[in-house]
Structure formats: structure tokens, C-alpha cells
């Protein structure tokens, strides 16, 4: 879809009031990951009136792919070079960023152990100890490939609430697996939480940053319509190259009253170069294995807040089945579920959950931790 702006947006348009011009063009940020051709995210300045965004949209011939009004004001659309130039001159535009590809952070392997580890001070245990409140009254949004809500492990507590594709069905399995680690009956950390699926990735586990932002924008609004008296968590087991707009959206979702847990990434590299992992205000999760080693694939660096079990994690899968896979994608829902569990107990809030989890973590237990990276492993501190 190619968008064009009516001449009334241009200062030289005859008979029309000129749009105030800026002294220099708004920044155009190049994608650091795999670029989506001619696709852009346009972010309006903080404090810009929604009416300014709406007025600009009315002057566009065609419909944007996404309009953002919650995590920030802006839109995503296919634009030609001239349109980008016009929008960069708009006084209310903060920046324009090229859209990029985002993918799941998972890989295949075998066997369950993560639940036992987050309720123990040492590795090698086989029992998960937890308070029977188990996250009841909390809600967790799984922003992913969808959730197979009919899976018996979810006991009717899961539902799909938004999709950006032709179908809301999870045709991949990744989202269902993550949701299972958050809150399924057998494999979940918070076994009584409500699970809401937001499908932002396709059945190949791939998507675009503009759609990820749309999903976060949706959650920032939708949470107000849900009954979640103990708190709201969002789990994002996905990522790509660094993106200012994705980080901004994640930060705003966090500040809106949602605990945001994100995957550090599977590149065995510094997470500061990836998004949303590099956003400082969200909870960035690295992966560990059953022997308390940093998983060989896990990203690291100063932006990490916590590690969670991420190698060979057994959980729910599509078709009413189960599967064991690995990735920081698997570590993230452990922490998201733990946040929901702790919020139900009144131990913390969405605003402080990541810091609380870090403060009460098992400290110094992990090996293969690079310099400058936290050595903290998530722990529920359950006392029988």
C-alpha cells in the first residue's frame, strides 16, 4: 500500500495555511535488523495532541497499517521517499524509523526441570514448591504467535483477545509453549493466572516491529477492560535488531502499569544491540540450563536483569500436546509467571516486580557469566 498526502499538507499549496516547518528534518532511523522495504514507523513527539495525529491521518490518501495512540502517538505505513521527506518536515514528528523483521527466540531440544529450579536454592531438584494462590487474580498477556486456548492444560483460563493476521489460531506452537510456562496446570509457574493471547507473529514465528508495537499499544488499552485485581504482566519472547520505536513502546507499556518481561535474545551477544531487550525499564531475561550455566545461546550484558530456566523446557504445544524447546523465549515466561505469582501474594507490583525478582534471586549460582552481566537466577522464595 502506497500512501500520499494531499497538497494541503505542503507549505506551498495554494490557498492553504502552511504547516509550521522545522529548522531541520526529523531523524530517519535505519533498521539494524532485516529491513522491511518501504515500511516505516512514524513516531509523534511526546505531548503531541492526539488531534494532531488524527488531523494528519485525515490528510493521507489510504489507510496506515497501524495507528498507535496508547504506548505513543504515531502510525506505521508503506511510504515512498517523497512521503518520508514530507513527514520528516512535520513539526510534530519526533522521528521516522524503518520497519524491521522480528522473530521468536527459540530452538529445539528435550526435558522439564525449570519449575523445580525456580523454587529451589540449588540445582538438581525435581519438585516445584509454590503457594496455592498460584497467580489467581492476575493476568498475563502473551504477545507471540497466539495461544491454543482449547488446550486442556489451560483449564479454560486462556483466550485469544487480538490477532493481526487472518486467523487467531496458533499455527506455530511457540506462543502456546510460552503460555504454558506462564500458567498451564502442569508446566506453569502461575497455575491460576488468566492468559490472554495477542498474535503479533505469523505461523512461521516471524513478524514486523510495527505489528509488535501495535500489540503493545493494544495491551496498554485492553488491560483497562479486564478483571485483573492482582496485576497485569506482558510476556514478549521475541526480538530483532535495535529499534528506538519498539523500545519506546515497551517503556510506555511498562509505565502504564504492566510488568513487561522480554527475551534477551539467542545470539550469544550483547543484548544492548537488540530490541526490546535493550530497553532499560523492562525486565530483560537471559537463559540458563539445568546445570546452572548460562545457556550457550543466551545474550548477555548490562541490560540483563535476571536469568531464568531456558534450556530444554517442556511445556504445552499445539494439537493438545507438549514439546521441549530451548531459548530465552522459554526463560522469559518463567519470569513473567513468577511476577504474576508474586503480585498475587502482594509481594510486589507491576512497577517494582522486576527489581523485586532480582533482589530475591539466587545470587552467584550461575557459571559462564560474562563480565558486566548480572549473576541472578529467578527464585520464588517459597517457604513451606
Swiss-Prot record:
InterPro entries: PCSK9_ProteinaseK-like, Peptidase_S8/S53_dom, Peptidase_S8/S53_dom_sf, Peptidase_S8_Asp-AS, Peptidase_S8_His-AS, Peptidase_S8_Ser-AS, Peptidase_S8_subtilisin-like, Peptidase_S8_subtilisin-rel. Residues 16-105 form a propeptide. Keywords: Calcium, Disulfide bond, Hydrolase, Metal-binding, Protease, Serine protease, Signal, Zymogen. Its EC number is 3.4.21.64. Disulfide bonds join 139-228, 283-354. Ca(2+) 1 binds at residues 280, 282, 305. It comes from the Eukaryota. Residues 39-104 form the Inhibitor I9 domain. GO terms for biological process: proteolysis. Residues 1-15 form the signal peptide. One of its GO terms (molecular function) is metal ion binding. Binds 2 calcium ions per subunit. The active site is at residues 144, 174, 329. Residues 112-384 form the Peptidase S8 domain. It catalyses: Hydrolysis of keratin, and of other proteins with subtilisin-like specificity. Hydrolyzes peptide amides. The keyword Calcium applies. Ca(2+) 2 binds at residues 121, 365. The keyword Disulfide bond applies. Its cofactor is Ca(2+). Pfam families: Inhibitor_I9, Peptidase_S8. Hydrolyzes keratin at aromatic and hydrophobic residues. Belongs to the peptidase S8 family. This is Proteinase K. It comes from Parengyodontium album. The lineage of its organism: Eukaryota, Fungi, Dikarya, Ascomycota, Pezizomycotina.
Amino acid at each position: 500500500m502506497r500512501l500520499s498526502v494531499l497538497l494541503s499538507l505542503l507549505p506551498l499549496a495554494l490557498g492553504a495555511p502552511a504547516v509550521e516547518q522545522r529548522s531541520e528534518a526529523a531523524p530517519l532511523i535505519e533498521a539494524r535488523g532485516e529491513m522491511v522495504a518501504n515500511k516505516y514507523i512514524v513516531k509523534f513527539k511526546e505531548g503531541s495532541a492526539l488531534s494532531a495525529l488524527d488531523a494528519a491521518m485525515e490528510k493521507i490518501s489510504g489507510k496506515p497499517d497501524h495507528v498507535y495512540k496508547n504506548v505513543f502517538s504515531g502510525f506505521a505505513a508503506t511510504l515512498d521517499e517523497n512521503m518520508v521527506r514530507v513527514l520528516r518536515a512535520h513539526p510534530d514528528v519526533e522521528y521516522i524509523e524503518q520497519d524491521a523483521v522480528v522473530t521468536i527466540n527459540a530452538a529445539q531440544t528435550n526435558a522439564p526441570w525449570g519449575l523445580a529450579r525456580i523454587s529451589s536454592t540449588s540445582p538438581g531438584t525435581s519438585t516445584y514448591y509454590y503457594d496455592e494462590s498460584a497467580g489467581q487474580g492476575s493476568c498475563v498477556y502473551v504477545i507471540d504467535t497466539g495461544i491454543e486456548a482449547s488446550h486442556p492444560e489451560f483449564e479454560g483460563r486462556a483466550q485469544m483477545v487480538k490477532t493481526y493476521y487472518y486467523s487467531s489460531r496458533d499455527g506455530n506452537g511457540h506462543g502456546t509453549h510460552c503460555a504454558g510456562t506462564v500458567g498451564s496446570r502442569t508446566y506453569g509457574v502461575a497455575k491460576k493466572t488468566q492468559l490472554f493471547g495477542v498474535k503479533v507473529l505469523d505461523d512461521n514465528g516471524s513478524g514486523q516491529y510495527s505489528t509488535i508495537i501495535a500489540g503493545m499499544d493494544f495491551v496498554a488499552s485492553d488491560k483497562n477492560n479486564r478483571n485483573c485485581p492482582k496485576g497485569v504482566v506482558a510476556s514478549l519472547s521475541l526480538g530483532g535488531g535495535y529499534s528506538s520505536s519498539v523500545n519506546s513502546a515497551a517503556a510506555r507499556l511498562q509505565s502504564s502499569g504492566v510488568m513487561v518481561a522480554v527475551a534477551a535474545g539467542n545470539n550469544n551477544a550483547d543484548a544492548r544491540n537488540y530490541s526490546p531487550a535493550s530497553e532499560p525499564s523492562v525486565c530483560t531475561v537471559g537463559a540458563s540450563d539445568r546445570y546452572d550455566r548460562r545457556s550457550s545461546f543466551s545474550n548477555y550484558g548490562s541490560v540483563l536483569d535476571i536469568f531464568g530456566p531456558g534450556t530444554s523446557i517442556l511445556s504445552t504445544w499445539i494439537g493438545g500436546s507438549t514439546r521441549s524447546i530451548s531459548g530465552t523465549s522459554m526463560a522469559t515466561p518463567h519470569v513473567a509467571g513468577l511476577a504474576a505469582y508474586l503480585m498475587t501474594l502482594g509481594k510486589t507490583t507491576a512497577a517494582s516486580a522486576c527489581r523485586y525478582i532480582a533482589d530475591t534471586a539466587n545470587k552467584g549460582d550461575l557459571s559462564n557469566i560474562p563480565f558486566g552481566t548480572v549473576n541472578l537466577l529467578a527464585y520464588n522464595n517459597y517457604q513451606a
